[in-house]
């Protein structure tokens, strides 16, 4: 299972927290289960949860699968302007908040990812959150 740090807008985090959002869409995703620490951007600016992702789907496959539903195809085509993949959100866990200031203070060279960073070869953020 890959470990990564994913960045989220507060509105997206809120939808995951509420159980409304069941897929996470990105331009690139590895084709394997992911445990992601959730960094929430301004105004929160903190790691606030962990999300488990699995079962990567290509949006182009969904376009073919739902080709008889014009509304679904239109939504999929809109998503394809920005994303290639969707992964199922299989689990969510809220954690204690770790502020950006604390992360920068305690982890030399810490930078918030624009989309995501792998933590497999960088155990410091992982050990910080446990």
Regions found by a protein language model. Give the residues of each.
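Long, hydrophobic N-terminal alpha-helical segment
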Residues: 1-31
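Short coil-to-beta transition motif at edge beta-strands of beta-rich domains
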Residues: 30-38
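Catalytic phosphate/metal-binding cores of nucleic-acid and nucleotide-processing enzymes, i.e., regions
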Residues: 43
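Short beta-strand-centered aromatic/proline hotspots
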Residues: 48-54
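Residue-level recognition of beta-strand microenvironments
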Residues: 54-56, 92
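Conserved small/polar residues in nucleotide/adenosyl-binding loops
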Residues: 129-130
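Short, compact, well-ordered microdomains
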Residues: 95-115
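Short, solvent-exposed secondary-structure boundary/capping segments
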Residues: 59-69
């Amino acid at each position: 299972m890959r470990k990564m740090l994913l960045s989220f807008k507060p509105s997206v985090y809120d939808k995951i927290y509420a159980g409304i959002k069941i897929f996470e869409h990105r331009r690139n995703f590895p084709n394997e289960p992911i445990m992601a620490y959730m960094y929430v951007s301004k105004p929160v600016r903190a790691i606030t949860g962990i999300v488990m992702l699995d079962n990567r789907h290509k949006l182009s496959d969904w376009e073919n699968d739902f080709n008889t539903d014009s509304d679904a195809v239109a939504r999929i085509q809109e998503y394809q302007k920005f994303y290639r993949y969707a992964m199922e959100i299989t689990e969510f866990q809220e954690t204690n908040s770790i502020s950006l200031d604390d992360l920068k203070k305690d982890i030399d060279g810490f930078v918030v990812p624009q989309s995501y960073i792998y933590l497999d070869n960088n155990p410091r953020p992982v050990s910080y959150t446990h």
